A protein has these predicted regions:
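Acidic, low-complexity/disordered tracts enriched in E/D and polar residues
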Residues: 2-81, 154, 424-515, 559-561
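Intrinsically disordered, low-complexity terminal tails and inter-domain linkers enriched
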Residues: 5-10, 230-264
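Hydrophobic alpha-helical segments that drive targeting, anchoring, or assembly
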Residues: 16-17, 25, 34-129, 150, ...
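Long, charge-rich, low-complexity alpha-helical segments
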Residues: 78-127, 173-176, 502-561
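SAM-dependent Rossmann-like transferase core, predominantly class I methyltransferases
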Residues: 121-186, 191-205
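S-adenosylmethionine
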Residues: 159-170, 180-182, 197, 214-242, ...
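Conserved SAM-binding motif I beta-strand of class I
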Residues: 208-213
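Flexible, glycine-/basic-rich loop-and-beta segments that form/coincide
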Residues: 371-451
Length: 561
């Protein structure tokens, strides 16, 4: 048996994705809300140690805690039943599920596709992963229950090529990166990379959301999760796939308060990348595209294309280049991605060519992995491990290393890509940087502020900047380093508490500007005061302070009205 066929035999089976009518979804939502099954309730059930272990994909401590709770009395709590069934893959009695979901019942959960038929002992097992997701944003509290395919932690098998991910680290990173300014239209490009979680967040502040994916299965999960959140859905997520039945969601579902009040309307379209939205423009695009750099030789060694992450070739250059035709004036696209390192600044040179002419581009590299680290991570992500299949793992890893060596790839960078269309034609700005620090708070707010203030700065000449009366941002602190006994500091650092958590080594000019920027004095007045104190050249110092002002405003250290 070839490595590919051996791996296929060990993959998790793909059950049809769940599908619910608006009435079924409303009943299930009400049951879940009444059950008290939330993030904090699960943590309390498991205990701190077991909950932390489960987040590290160590299942046993959580199983022990849940089994103890189920055996504690004749009527186990709904939280214990639902956690055991949907998060840990345990079988539970039909009677226990009937009690936990009284409106839906076990029979209804089977009809929806959440659980299988009862076994001879009168117990059922989950066919999908379902778990609570909670957060707080500008619109208030978020309380959802999100379905996805069962992970290998439960199945003990490698993931199927059409596997639909749950809410994971990458999805939450993108959700935090995305600006939440109210918009008319938004696009979730590739909603399968996280079971539609970006779609749900976009519906919080967009009047109309379009979600696309090449996978009918991913669209079906997105449709189900949207219905469970009380969202109106149009489209046929199951079209063209016997494994993804149509959701039947063509009318507006009743939105419960627990859904997070998703008032927007959702349209689902199937197709690759930007093809399904040809000729359409949006005010915001969010995407975690299938950017993994999987060489053909690796697939020949037995690793199949995973729909949620692999496109069969480098996808980001084509995707980013095509954004120009799909962004309204003032709109932005935010996405996650990776790129190859072949020299000192090679990644900047390569990625800069992706950004379309006339658009602003901001690329933030957050991490770099060496070739072995990168390949190992994605092999394990797909369920191919040395413990499970040493021969197959070594063959795939060797093919990956060979490909990188032949092409001179020294590492792979991970980070964020933000592309912005100016409100009016102008010279675009480009910033490609390495930032590994993080500030407090949600990064999406910072992204929105940076795009807005850079748009404003682009329309100001130096005289206009000199007339500004900036204010030091409230999250900025100053740090001075002095040699003992010295009167003056040798180093002055400005630290940003929010945003990207940047640290700037301040020159005399920058320190003076930050020290008195309270909105009372203009930049020009501050420059004149520094000249009077230091005797430096007035023209040169003013120019330096104007340039420093532009930079400090652009990165969020200074604010302007």
């Amino acid at each position: 048996m070839s490595p590919a066929s051996a791996r296929s035999a060990s993959e998790s089976p793909s059950f049809p994705p769940p599908a619910a009518t608006p009435e079924q979804a409303a009943s299930l939502r009400a049951d879940l809300a009444d059950s008290g099954w939330g993030v904090e309730a699960v943590a309390a059930l498991l205990g701190e140690v077991a909950d932390a272990a489960l987040r590290r994909e160590i299942r046993l401590p959580a199983l022990r805690a849940v089994r103890a709770a189920l055996a504690a009395g004749p009527a186990p709590s709904p939280v214990a039943v639902l956690t055991a069934l949907f998060m840990l893959g345990e079988s539970v009695p039909v009677t226990a599920l009937d009690a936990a979901l009284p409106r839906t019942t076990a029979a209804g959960a089977t009809a929806i596709g959440l659980v299988g038929e009862p076994d001879g002992a009168g117990c059922v097992r989950a066919l999908v992963d379902l778990r609570p997701h909670e957060a707080v944003d500008d619109a208030g509290e978020v309380r959802w229950w999100v379905a996805s395919d069962l992970g290998e932690l439960v199945t003990g098998r490698a993931l199927a090529p059409d596997h639909v991910l749950g809410v994971g680290g990458a999805g939450l990173t993108l959700a935090g990166l995305t600006p939440r300014t109210p918009v008319r239209t938004a696009l979730d490009l590739g909603c399968g990379c996280g079971c539609g979680i970006q779609t749900l967040y976009l519906l919080r502040h967009a009047e109309h959301v379009v979600a696309t994916d090449i996978s009918a299965r991913a669209l079906a999960f997105t449709a189900f999760n949207a219905a469970l959140a009380g969202v109106s859905v149009t489209g046929a997520p199951g079209a063209g796939s016997d494994n993804a039945p149509s959701s039947g969601l063509d009318s507006e579902a009743d939105a419960a308060s627990e859904s997070g009040s998703n008032a927007g309307h959702l349209e689902l379209l199937r197709g690759s990348l930007l093809e399904p939205v040809a000729g359409r423009r949006f005010d915001l695009i969010a995407s975690n595209p299938p950017f993994v750099l999987t060489p053909p030789a690796v697939r020949e060694a037995g690793l199949p294309l995973m729909e949620y992450r692999d496109a069969g070739g480098p996808v980001l250059p084509e995707l980013v280049a095509g954004l120009r035709e799909h962004l309204e004036p003032g709109a932005a696209a935010v996405m996650l991605g990776n790129w190859e390192h072949r020299g000192a600044d090679s990644w900047r040179e390569a990625v800069a060519t992706w950004i379309p002419e006339g658009l602003d581009g901001w690329v933030i590299e957050r991490e770099v992995q060496d070739p072995v680290e990168y390949a190992t991570m994605w092999l394990r992500d797909g369920g191919l491990t040395s413990e499970r299949d040493a021969e197959g793992f070594d063959a795939a890893l060797g093919a990956w290393i060979d490909d990188f060596e032949v092409r001179g790839v020294q590492g792979v960078g991970f980070g964020y890509l933000i592309v912005h269309r100016p409100l009016r034609p102008r010279d675009p700005w480009r910033l490609l940087e390495e930032v590994t620090t993080s500030g407090q708070g949600v990064l999406g707010h910072h992204v929105a502020e940076v795009l807005e203030v850079r748009e404003r700065l682009a329309g100001l000449d130096d005289d206009a900047v000199a007339d500004l009366r900036p204010v030091l941002a409230p999250d900025v602190t100053e740090e001075r380093h002095l040699i003992p006994g010295a009167a003056e500091p040798t180093v002055i650092l400005l630290r940003q508490g929010g945003g990207l958590g940047r640290t700037i080594r301040a020159s005399t000019v920058v320190a003076a500007l930050a020290g008195v920027a309270d909105g009372e004095l203009s930049v020009g007045q501050i420059a004149s005061a520094v000249v009077a104190l230091t005797g430096e050249d007035a023209i040169g110092l003013r120019a330096e302070m104007v340039e420093a002002t532009r930079h400090l405003i652009a990165v969020g250290f200074l604010t302007i009205d």
